[in-house]
């Protein structure tokens, strides 16, 4: 194992030698060549020539690293270490070499200052000076083969100990990313990052490079460089240079903070806006989230459709979970956004938000509340007022009695309205009169015999249906428990109502169906046709419905015993059958029948039938028994 590079103490080891020894095309995060050509602009070579080993004391991240582009292809898989303070820089080269060796062995002491270089480091606790290494008479060994060049805008630090072996494979190197537009030169010269304006001119030995015109990353301090190199508007004002800081340098931000800002801004813009807005758009307030879209537009400027391999979803989730401790230390919590003003911020109104943000907002959208109004009129007001005058014929809709006003209280749920009416208006068991005083009630003050009947009646006005069907998938609700009880028999198949006639085993789910069936046994025909001139009658309404189809379609080819002519009306035509002339002399055609209830009239049992054919020479009778009910297709005719 060869000794570390820092212990060899070469007389004048320069990074320019390493840069000129092997030149490889720079690669970005995806492993493809750089976006804007070779990142080493014209000032990079000249600036590297003046960089010496002592300049690495304040920025160990610029040191050579065994990591190549293939190790840094995925930035999301590498850990990001928290920030720490930097060692002070000393002019002595041996001491700087010793500190560089100590940084390799103990990586926790390194930091990543924003500016880099000796001018951007602030000593926290100066360590004891290391003893100078004894000079060796032997000539220095040749420099090792240069490693592949690091990524533009990336530096690496050793974040995990692996003993003092110094091997690259036994240590966990952490990728740090400088998000400024001039990352290559600024990291080695201490030049301003992005739009951070610290000094207008550089030193004679280290000239400040011109601002990069194709900046791709936002500044570490939350600013963005303008086209002319001047500082742009502040995107994150809480992260600006602190006035009280020595040298006007801001607090150092580690790579995790910078990557989080860029990814969160890009995710917020892609999720909420779906488009990039100008990075210099005016804002009404620093806390307005329109600045997030501006930051995202600035961060994504110049990338086009290139895949950044950034886990924007994870960054957005982390940003939604809350700011990290480092952000909370430097910036106060953001204020809630102001109410939308269409004249100033028309971009705030997005009815259809794409992606997860739209689904979340649809979930959080409050439902429209339905206002339920109580229209119960106080009976005390009705008692103190004179009776209303009789309505003139024709009666218009009657106004409230005597001008009495209803309760008019509004409620958000049906449960609240029902409780209000029951407790405040209906009253308890002390009430002897059970009268409905709902506005425009058709009962007109007619009382009920019991309180529960009044409560059931009030459901007609309120629309309450408190009895839902318990069977899954049904979804029917009922206002009365008796109706629900009858309905549940359709699911269970229960038929508790047995036919009362001997020898008949028919059963029914409700008593009304059993009553209809009983006419089969009594030979009563209470359901007769209402078409004038047709005297057909039946014992069951289903048979009458089958008969009514004859009046709605063409008759058979021969006139038949019914006496209908061969010319009929098509299906759906008005019910105006053409009867036989012998029968039509004493009958008139009925108008169009539009309601099923007008098709038949249920007569009382034993009532005489008065609709007979005048030409009949005997008593009209029909032998209709159980088989016609069992087979509804069979229609008996009158002879």
From Swiss-Prot:
Statement: the UniProt record of this protein carries the keyword Zinc-finger: yes
Start-end of C2H2-type zinc fingers: 434-461, 467-491, 497-521, 527-551
InterPro entries membership: GLI-like (IPR043359), Znf-C2H2_ZIC1-5/GLI1-3-like (IPR056436), Znf_C2H2_sf (IPR036236), Znf_C2H2_type (IPR013087), Znf_ZIC (IPR041643)
Region of interest (Disordered), residue spans: 113-171, 189-251, 323-355, 379-409, 548-568, 607-639
Bias type Polar residues, positions: 612-621
UniProt entry keywords in alphabetical sequence: Developmental protein, Differentiation, DNA-binding, Metal-binding, Neurogenesis, Nucleus, Phosphoprotein, Repeat, Zinc, Zinc-finger
Subcellular location: Nucleus
Domain of life the protein comes from: Eukaryota
UniProt-listed Gene3D superfamilies: Classic Zinc Finger
Compositional bias annotation for Pro residues: 124-150, 331-343, 385-401
Residues recorded with modification Phosphoserine: 554, 558, 576
Single GO cellular component term: nucleus
A GO BP entry: central nervous system development
Any one GO molecular-function label of the UniProt entry: DNA-binding transcription factor activity, RNA polymerase II-specific
Any matching Pfam family: zf_ZIC
UniProt similarity note: Belongs to the GLI C2H2-type zinc-finger protein family.
Task performed by this protein: Essential for neural crest development, converting cells from an epidermal fate to a neural crest cell fate. Binds to DNA.
Identification of the protein by name: Zinc finger protein ZIC 5
